[in-house]
């Protein structure tokens, strides 16, 4: 997403300043993880679109690890992670039919 051009007020309280420093670091980490998640999903969908069941299965295995790690870190709710895995799995199973 685009960065905000709004000028933010500086915080006076020490704990607030620390919170701002932490937010910058955590925001960067979350953005990176979210990007890794999207890339993993796209890889599986691309493999499904080509119709290659073997490649789709391999990419799904690696995507599962990424999805689970993101759910464990609390970036997404565990139910959302389960929903993504379920839908991707259904698409791969549909290739066999």
UniProtKB/Swiss-Prot annotation:
UniProt keyword annotation of rRNA-binding present: yes
One example GO MF annotation: structural constituent of ribosome
GO BP term (any one): translation
GO CC annotations on file: cytosol; small ribosomal subunit
UniProt xrefs under SUPFAM superfamilies: Ribosomal protein S20
Family matches, as HAMAP family: Ribosomal_bS20
Name this polypeptide is given: Small ribosomal subunit protein bS20
Taxon lineage: Bacteria, Pseudomonadati, Pseudomonadota, Betaproteobacteria, Burkholderiales
